[in-house]
């Protein structure tokens, strides 16, 4: 087994074939991409899967270029065994098969210092999705002893509490957990 170049997501089996797999960023599970004759072919499969899952922010083995249609693809020095479109469709099917939930997401508490907001931030899986704020609370500029230590004005705090009560009936379990995290952080002294 001679490793002339190590590729991300690629390993060589004892008998010489190359395999590729990728870890799903939100599900924290490995997705099997297949067995290949060369390390380069396995690396191209990894790159296509990374682009499908992470979009233009993907860490790839080969340079990524924009096509005329506006989609990302890996710059291919050698002709691949499959066309980029058919490879993309195959990998997309494998990724869908590995995900029981079609819209997995990562939700976390985040502080936006640029616009003085604290809130719940969510990133859904997929190359075409972008991170969004689920809920934001505006932090006040003046620190008030009667308000929360983070500087929420009492008026903003009352408005937020009223909105929370109205929306509480329709909030999912994941969102409810995120709201509790915000509440604990705001009430923490």
UniProtKB/Swiss-Prot annotation:
Coiled coil: none annotated. It is found in: Nucleus. Keywords: Activator, DNA-binding, Ethylene signaling pathway, Nucleus, Transcription, Transcription regulation. One of its GO terms (biological process) is ethylene-activated signaling pathway. Residues 6-63 bind DNA. Promotes cuticle formation by inducing the expression of enzymes involved in wax biosynthesis. Probably acts as a transcriptional activator. Binds to the GCC-box pathogenesis-related promoter element. May be involved in the regulation of gene expression by stress factors and by components of stress signal transduction pathways. This is Ethylene-responsive transcription factor SHINE 2. In flowers. One of its GO terms (cellular component) is nucleus. The gene is SHN2. Disulfide bonds: none annotated. Belongs to the AP2/ERF transcription factor family. ERF subfamily. SMART domains: AP2 (SM00380). InterPro entries: AP2/ERF_dom, AP2/ERF_dom_sf, AP2/ERF_ERF_subfamily, DNA-bd_dom_sf. It comes from Arabidopsis thaliana. GO terms for molecular function: DNA binding; DNA-binding transcription factor activity.
């Amino acid at each position: 087994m001679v490793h002339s170049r190590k590729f991300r997501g690629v390993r060589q089996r004892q008998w010489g074939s190359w395999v590729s797999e990728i870890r799903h960023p939100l599900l924290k599970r490995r997705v099997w991409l297949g067995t290949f004759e060369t390390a380069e072919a396995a690396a191209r499969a990894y790159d296509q899967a990374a682009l499908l899952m992470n979009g233009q922010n993907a860490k790839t083995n080969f340079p990524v270029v924009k096509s005329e249609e506006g989609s990302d693809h890996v710059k291919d020095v050698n002709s691949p065994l499959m066309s980029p479109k058919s490879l993309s469709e195959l990998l997309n099917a494998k990724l869908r098969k590995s995900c029981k939930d079609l819209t997995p997401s990562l939700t976390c508490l985040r502080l936006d210092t640029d616009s003085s907001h604290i809130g719940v931030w969510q990133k859904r899986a997929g190359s075409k999705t972008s991170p969004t704020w689920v809920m934001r609370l505006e932090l006040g500029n003046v620190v008030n002893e009667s308000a929360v230590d983070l500087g929420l004005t009492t008026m903003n705090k009352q408005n937020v509490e009223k909105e929370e009560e109205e929306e509480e009936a329709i909030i999912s379990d994941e969102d409810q957990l995120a709201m509790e995290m915000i509440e604990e952080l705001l009430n923490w002294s």
